[in-house]
């Protein structure tokens, strides 16, 4: 289980402050939000800080009992781009749809912070403990 940077570390490579090798547990990369092609008024603020919705893309035991579109707390400037779309458990829209939760076999991680996400976040932690 990983949160925020813990999610990002699971992937092959990160481009945060250079090019850095990740753990390679999941294939893919970590990139910065880039809204340079939009007008100033259309650009979401980076870092992405605050509450946003997570939309479930597949049944996942860690998301059991969580409403689709539930709000979670985010604080990040980078996001993961998995090579395999089948690992994406949930997505979030912040100027683009990005993977906000991934799940494969016994690996589960979120870009959001369950520990700061009140009842929904506690439910995810309870689901983990209950496995």
Predicted regions and their residues:
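Cysteine-nucleophile active-site neighborhood
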Residues: 1-48
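Amide-donor transfer/coupling interface in amidating biosynthetic enzymes
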Residues: 28-131
């Amino acid at each position: 289980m990983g949160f925020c940077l813990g999610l990002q570390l699971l992937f092959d490579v990160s481009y945060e402050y250079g090019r850095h090798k990740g753990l390679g547990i999941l294939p893919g990369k970590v990139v910065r939000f880039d809204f340079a092609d939009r007008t100033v008024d259309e650009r979401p603020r980076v870092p992405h800080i605050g509450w946003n919705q997570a939309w479930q893309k597949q049944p996942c035991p860690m998301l059991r009992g969580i409403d689709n579109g539930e709000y979670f707390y985010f604080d990040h400037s980078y996001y993961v781009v998995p090579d395999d779309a089948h690992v994406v458990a949930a997505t979030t829209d912040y100027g683009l749809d990005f993977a906000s939760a991934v799940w494969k076999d016994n690996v589960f991680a979120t870009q959001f912070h369950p520990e700061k996400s009140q009842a929904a976040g506690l439910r995810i932690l309870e689901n983990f403990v209950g496995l």
